């Protein structure tokens, strides 16, 4: 396994000269996420009495956000992650196109796989928070495996992810934690910095998956 610095350097080397398509994919993905979660935050404001809203409208907005996350954001997230994997492996820079192609090819399998992984994390979290977090890292490779192994069921992808992540969960946690400084800087730009941070992080995570796959 490479070091965090090596993953980040690999990501930056791949992105050099390819920031335009990476930013386009990032804008589209982040835009979709915000469009889906904004109604939820609007309901939050209403719940705290900061704005007035009818209970029925609050319920409808919550349903919209929940269904939007399940049926739109999650599968597009699968496509987004795999677009960057193909970018890191083969230099395919049509990231926006690859994102949607990956999301909607095998759409219901993507939806079911991510839902099932999230449901298992939820069940583990009912016991204690820490087991839920650990299981979340165990299932971290599911988005990649759903696309790379179409012959496997969603549950098989989850089990394979658990096996591949044995002894590597802290490595991924440490890699994610190494971006905390960039997250803080991005927040200071009212989120604009996320447009650059997201592709940088996704490319780094794809490089991590490449190593896990190679060593498994």
Language model features: what each stretch is:
Residues 1-216:
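Hydrophobic alpha-helical membrane segments
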